[in-house]
A protein has these predicted regions:
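Sec-exported extracytoplasmic/periplasmic mature domains
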Residues: 43-47, 106, 123-129
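Acidic/histidine-rich, surface-exposed loop or edge segments in extracytoplasmic proteins
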Residues: 18-26
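Active-site scaffold of zinc-dependent metalloenzymes
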Residues: 59-89, 101-104
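Short helix/loop segments within enzyme catalytic domains
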Residues: 26, 34, 112-155
Length: 158
């Protein structure tokens, strides 16, 4: 695993520069969906009981990450780089949010197993694997660091 590509392995206290949640709307065939509603839907499908807030930030060097709001005991917050999310399709946003929720699931169920691959395995319970490929390509393009797709999401199904 390449450290520079890691979206976030450890849940750290929330940075002071994080802005409070904005309900970004995403176009979907079914209409307009808020980023928070999408997160809540995926959280429910993954049976995550803990509250998870979503917020857009002007700059996130990890492009997307999950942290605890008030240290290790507080609610979770997913911080999304405002410019990066504009590059993603609805399916890609869903895959990326599901990945971050995978970190929450791991943290709340297995605190010592916080890995990218496991988070993606959890996320792929509710989103299609093919949505992850362009997400990682865009992360790597934006960060300038390249990773091995199979390390992060496994080999394609046959």
């Amino acid at each position: 695993m390449h450290i520079g590509v890691v979206l976030l392995l450890w849940l750290l206290p929330l940075r002071p520069d994080v802005q409070q949640a904005a309900l970004t709307e995403l176009s979907d065939k079914a209409g307009i969906v808020s980023l928070q509603d999408l997160t809540d839907d995926l959280r429910g499908r993954l049976e995550i009981k803990e509250r998870v807030h979503v917020t857009l930030v002007d700059h996130n060097p990890l492009v997307m990450s999950v942290e605890t709001l008030n240290g290790r005991g507080g609610p979770f917050v997913i911080s999304v780089d405002r410019d990066f999310i504009q590059e993603l399709t609805h399916a890609e946003v869903e895959a990326a949010i599901a990945h971050e929720l995978g970190h929450v699931w791991i943290y709340t169920h297995h605190p010592f197993l916080q890995t990218e691959r496991l988070a993606n395995d959890i996320a792929m319970r509710v989103v299609n694997r093919s949505a992850f490929e362009p997400v990682y390509e865009k992360v790597w393009q934006r960060t300038g660091i390249r990773g091995n797709l199979i390390e992060f999401i496994g080999p394609p199904s046959q």
